[in-house]
Amino acid sequence: MRSKFIVGLAVAACMALALQLEVSAQQGRGRGAAAGGTTAGAGRGYPTPEQYANSKEAQAHVAKARAIAGNDPKLIMRWENTCGALGPQRPALEAQNAGKAVAPNTPVEPVQIFDNMWYFGLNTIGAWAIRTSDGIILIDALNTVQEAETLIEPALRKVGLNPADVKYVIVGHGHFDHFGGAPYFQDKYKARIAMSGPDWDLVERPNPNANPAQANRPRPKRDVVVTEGQKITVGDTTITLHITPGHTVGSLAYLIPVRYQGKPLTVLMLSGANITPDRASLEAFHKALDYAKAAGAQALLNGHPGLFGDESGWMDELRKNPKGRNDFVYTREQFAKFVDIMKECAASRVVAMGL
């Protein structure tokens, strides 16, 4: 089993290098450029640094967010990461915007974040597996069917899960790096594929910016159409989904019940919801955050490690010491403050654009 996993990593590393070239080309067309289609707000979703710095109203939101963080080092880091003209950025985009070399995509060892939740995939994009009493829910599925076969499938087996038990793949938004591997589980294991209606449309719509390799990739067949507030239940686990337009028209936010050290804990997962190019997307984002606060959430996850902190480093620590400190976890009071920080920082960008 280990030898198969190592072979899979080697194959995936080669594919990841090719995909890195593809992603760099996409990013070169602007931060709004999308693998699966056109991103909502592409090229207009953020204020310029000058707009941001010169807007008194925006800076008032920034100051309020800083006050909420108080003297808590963890919250101060989240404020520094979240407030700014571009908001939280993936490390690859941050490096690119700074004119630095972008680190290549590389496969990583699976890591258990909570008692019943794991991360698989690459250092820059991943899939999440949630074990329930009656099967597995996957969140996202990497870039391609090949990555699903050579990375996700062997990783599931490595942590003691059976890929045949995957009941759902819930896709956070309709870009290739999230839905690319979904057809593999749909075709081989008959897993249900869930995505918002607007993003099913995005997946099915021809993308004029796609290169030939992208254009010819398999796409999942339309299946479960997620609506606002929809719940998906497998066994003892019910995930609640909220539609948060911004990165795409139908980007999702998830409320996921997990267990941590034997106790229940609620996770908020954002799939692009931190991008709010207009008032409507800001209001939807705020509502999703309010739902998370009301649910007593204590952790924030997303598909791209590094978006909200040194998440790759936190994962490395959990690989070394699975029972050690878990930096993904907040107290309820901390997380409620983090929610308010995110709300103020998102509002600061919208008002800086004069919206």
Where do the protein language model's features map onto the residues?
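Positively charged n-region of N-terminal signal peptides that target proteins for export
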Residues: 1-5
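Bacterial N-terminal signal peptides
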Residues: 8-20
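Zn-dependent metallo-beta-lactamase
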Residues: 27-135, 145, 355
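Active-site HxH/HxHxD metal-binding segment of metal-dependent hydrolases
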Residues: 54-57, 67, 117, 146-150, ...
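Conserved beta-strand hairpin/beta-sheet module of binuclear metal-dependent hydrolase folds
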Residues: 103-159, 253-274
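Short, hydrophobic/aromatic-rich segments at coil-to-beta transitions
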Residues: 112-118, 229, 237-240
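Divalent metal-coordination and catalytic microenvironments
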Residues: 116, 130, 140, 173, ...
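Metallo-beta-lactamase
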Residues: 135-136, 143-145, 221-223, 231-233, ...
